Curated annotation (Swiss-Prot):
GO function term, MF aspect, one: zinc ion binding
Record GO biological process: negative regulation of DNA-templated transcription
Protein name from the UniProt record: Transcriptional repressor NrdR
InterPro entries tied to this protein: ATP-cone_dom, NrdR-like_N, RNR_NrdR-like
Keyword Transcription set for record: yes
Keyword Zinc-finger: yes
Origin species: Granulibacter bethesdensis (strain ATCC BAA-1260 / CGDNIH1)
Keywords: ATP-binding, DNA-binding, Metal-binding, Nucleotide-binding, Repressor, Transcription, Transcription regulation, Zinc, Zinc-finger
ZnF unnamed span: 3-34
Pfam families given in the database record: ATP-cone, Zn_ribbon_NrdR
Stated role: Negatively regulates transcription of bacterial ribonucleotide reductase nrd genes and operons by binding to NrdR-boxes.
Family: Belongs to the NrdR family.
HAMAP family per record: NrdR
Cofactor note text: Binds 1 zinc ion.
Length: 157
């Protein structure tokens, strides 16, 4: 593997261990040229997913982009990083197990919202504000009003 610091082609694996949830292998590597150390993560990829954007463009699914989006929504929230990783893994597994190669971006957004709603209300609203393109305070009020109404109907049943 190429060193991210100096670009040298030869690196050595110093340590390998499975992640806590067992879905990946974390490898500690060392560059033989500059001696810098870095970590890589190896995961099983069941199939290459293609995301169908709203304008019908197709792009390769990027797990890192999904992770960044969720981390932005959860920024400064008291959520353990391992829990975030498990959330991301759960979403990706749902997408991979759907049997579809092409996944609408809307489905990914809805899965993220559903997951965030179960984990943290503030992160859920943050993500929804970007995903649903809120433009003013009225959009927040409408969204939160709908959430309060659905919460009340859940509690009364």
């Amino acid at each position: 593997m190429r060193c991210p610091f100096c670009g040298h082609e030869d690196t050595q694996v110093k340590d390998s261990r499975p992640t806590d949830d067992g879905t990946a292998i974390r490898r500690r590597r060392s560059c033989t040229a500059c001696m810098q150390r870095f970590t890589t993560v190896e995961r099983v990829q069941l199939r290459e997913l293609i995301v169908v954007k709203t304008d019908q463009r197709r792009v390769v699914f990027d797990r890192d982009k999904l992770t960044r989006s969720v981390q932005i929504a959860l920024r400064k929230r008291p959520i353990d990083p391992d829990r975030i990783e498990k959330m991301i893994t759960g979403i990706v597994r749902q997408l991979e197990s759907s049997g579809e190669t092409e996944i609408p971006s809307k489905l990914i957004g809805e899965l993220v919202m559903q997951t965030l709603k179960e984990v943290d209300d503030v992160a859920y609203v943050r993500f929804a504000s970007v995903y649903r393109n809120f433009s003013d305070a009225g959009d927040f009020q409408t969204f939160l009003g709908g959430q309060a109404a659905s919460k009340e109907s859940d509690e009364s049943s």
